[in-house]
């Protein structure tokens, strides 16, 4: 049994600080954790993204159709017959890239967006000292104009990755922060419409493939459901429905206990609308960029995602087969059936010898 290793990079960027003044005439910053129900919060989020309902519905319909048209079906009995591609079994080293708006502060890590709304965290202190400077209306949205990527050169990155000996490259398409690092037709908050105003993911995909490397991507959209929940407990812009399309529902996270993230005990509110949106966004990524690897974080194992995950896996495997390649899905912990995809250990490794290939990233 071979172990695959994926090295993770977290990139920071510096920027000057410029903010626009809020013109809100009411108090949209007031805490909402105790004053709004989960259903009301979810309704506000749905309304904020309603203009994309047509494209979302199209993508979901496409996923459902392709999921039932090919060698796989959207059920675990079928998906457990999955076979990894030989190139992936033979690969020893890959590059995983964390890079996004959260790089602007050049502090903490990619969980900065969550922790900047939690008063006990260093990111909260950093943001208020260096960016907000006493203005409660400032939030993560105000870091986006500072993320310009003016020195980003995909060809140079790809050349360095090639010289490092990596066989595959997996940049984050969207992290928990909800900002799409790709050209999404389902959001206003994208790297094409704001900040750099260019499709950095698309540029990197082209450059990586030009170097003869395999291209994948990661999606952390599932976790966005709760990521900004700290902002609902304090005065912050997370409470303003005007920004619900960026901050998402920000439902209170009832985290499962235990080091293994036993998600069967996770009681966080997840609506059908959210899992449908998740399916649409990941379908969009596959159709636009044709990744050979799709990496998911642990929260796709939350019980409410089971049906959507099976639908996506069958869609992706069938789509890849129809386009001449074999797709790989990475998952963490116990969030997916071991036989249906490739298990990834973040900052860890398999504790015993098993027949299946697995991956570690650090």
What are the residue ranges of the model-derived segments?
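Mature catalytic domains of secreted/periplasmic carbohydrate-active enzymes
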Residues: 21-362
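Bacterial N-terminal signal peptides
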Residues: 6-16
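Positively charged n-region of N-terminal signal peptides that target proteins for export
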Residues: 1-4
């Amino acid at each position: 049994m071979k172990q695959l290793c994926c090295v993770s990079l977290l990139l920071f960027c510096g920027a000057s600080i410029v903010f626009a003044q809020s013109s809100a005439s009411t108090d949209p910053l007031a805490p909402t954790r105790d004053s709004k129900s989960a259903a009301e919060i979810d309704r506000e989020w749905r309304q904020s993204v309603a203009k994309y309902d047509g494209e979302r519905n199209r993508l979901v319909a496409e996923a459902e159709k392709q999921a039932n048209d090919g060698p796989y079906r959207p059920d675990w009995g079928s998906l457990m017959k999955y076979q990894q591609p030989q190139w992936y079994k033979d690969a020893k080293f890959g590059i995983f890239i964390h890079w996004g708006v959260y790089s602007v502060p050049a502090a903490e890590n990619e969980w900065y967006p969550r922790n900047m709304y939690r008063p006990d965290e260093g990111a909260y202190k950093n943001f208020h000292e260096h960016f907000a400077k006493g203005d409660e209306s400032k939030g993560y949205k105000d870091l986006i104009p500072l993320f310009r990527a003016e020195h980003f050169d995909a060809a140079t990155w790809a050349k360095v990755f090639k010289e490092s000996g990596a066989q595959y490259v997996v940049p984050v398409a969207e992290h928990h922060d909800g900002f799409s690092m790709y050209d999404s037709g389902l959001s206003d908050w994208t790297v094409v419409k704001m900040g750099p105003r260019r499709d950095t993911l698309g540029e990197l995909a082209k450059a990586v493939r030009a170097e003869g490397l395999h291209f994948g991507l990661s999606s952390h959209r599932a976790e966005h459901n709760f990521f900004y929940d700290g902002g609902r407990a304090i005065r912050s812009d997370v409470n303003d429905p005007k920004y619900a399309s960026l901050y998402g529902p920000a439902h209170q996270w009832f985290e499962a206990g235990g080091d293994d993230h036993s998600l069967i005990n996770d009681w966080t509110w997840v609506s059908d609308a959210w899992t449908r949106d998740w399916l649409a966004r990941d379908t969009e990524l596959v159709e636009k960029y044709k990744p050979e690897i799709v990496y998911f974080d642990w929260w796709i194992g939350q019980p409410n995602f089971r049906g959507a995950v099976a639908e996506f896996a069958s869609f992706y495997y069938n789509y890849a087969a129809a386009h001449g390649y074999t797709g790989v899905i990475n998952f963490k912990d116990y969030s997916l059936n071991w036989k249906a995809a490739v298990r990834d250990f973040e900052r860890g490794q398999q504790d015993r010898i098993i027949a299946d290939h697995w991956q570690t990233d650090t």
